Regions:
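N-terminal beta1-alpha1-beta2 submodule of the flavodoxin-like/Rossmannoid cofactor-binding fold
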Residues: 1-98, 102, 181-195
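Short histidine/acidic/glycine/proline-rich micro-motifs that form metal-
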Residues: 9-13, 131-135, 165-167
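Hydrophobic residues at beta-strand termini and immediately following loops
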Residues: 34, 127, 160
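Structured loop/turn residues at beta-strand edges in well-structured enzyme cores
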Residues: 73, 91, 119, 152-155
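Conserved nucleotide-sugar donor-interacting segment of glycosyltransferase catalytic cores
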Residues: 102-112
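Short, glycine-/small-residue-rich phosphate/pyrophosphate-handling segment
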Residues: 110-152
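Glycine-rich phosphate/pyrophosphate-binding loop and the adjoining helix
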Residues: 135-136, 142-195
């Protein structure tokens, strides 16, 4: 099994990353680590979009511009780790999504105009933490879930969150341990599937 770990955290002492490491360290698999803060993934602009469209129209996917999309499409499981910022996630993750969402690699349009997901992965795990309360799961996690299921063809989406971490009087360690318990259930599911 090959896991793609997409890290959209930027703080070295990230609590989101702590939960992710807890999970990742307990799933035996080949792991590709992608720290988005170390990558130079920029928002799509007209020049890049036109270049990419020329390549995809010609079905020329050998250009290095597509390596993020190929890694994503070929992973067996994807773990996305992002703090809850501004009702969703950091811009780093949105830039990455624009880079991977390539027609012909991650998805395709059928003759009827419907979307057909091309990803090998059957599982995506989304991990987030918030200093306050997560107002709605729809904006961050919900967006990732819809994109993964409807566009990428990934069936099983798991969600681990720890919220209220910066609220005065919060029992931070207990909140994080509860998130790790959710991770334990996912680990058990993976171990059962792979035995």
């Amino acid at each position: 099994m090959k896991i793609l770990y997409v890290n959209a955290t930027v703080r070295p002492d990230s609590r989101t990353k702590r939960i992710a490491r807890y999970l990742l360290d307990r799933i035996p698999a080949e792991k590709k680590i992608l720290n988005l803060g170390d990558e130079d993934i920029r928002p799509l602009n007209n020049e890049v979009l036109e270049f990419r469209t020329r390549l995809t129209s010609a079905k020329d996917f050998e250009n290095g511009i597509f390596h993020y999309a190929k890694d994503y499409a070929q992973a067996d499981t994807i773990i996305i780790v992002a703090p809850y910022w501004d009702l969703s996630f950091p811009a780093l993750l949105k830039n990455y999504i624009e880079a991977i969402n390539v027609n012909g690699i991650v998805f395709r349009y059928t003759d009827k105009g419907e979307v057909d997901g091309l990803c090998k992965a059957k599982n995506l795990i989304y991990i987030t933490t918030a200093g306050g309360k997560i107002i709605s799961d729809d904006y961050g996690f919900g967006y990732i879930k819809e994109l993964a299921q409807k566009f990428h063809g990934i069936e099983n989406i798991e969600y681990i969150k720890a919220e209220g971490l910066d609220i005065e009087g919060a029992e931070v360690e207990k909140i994080l341990q509860n998130a790790e318990k959710k991770a334990d259930k996912i680990i058990e599911m993976f171990n059962n599937k792979n035995n």
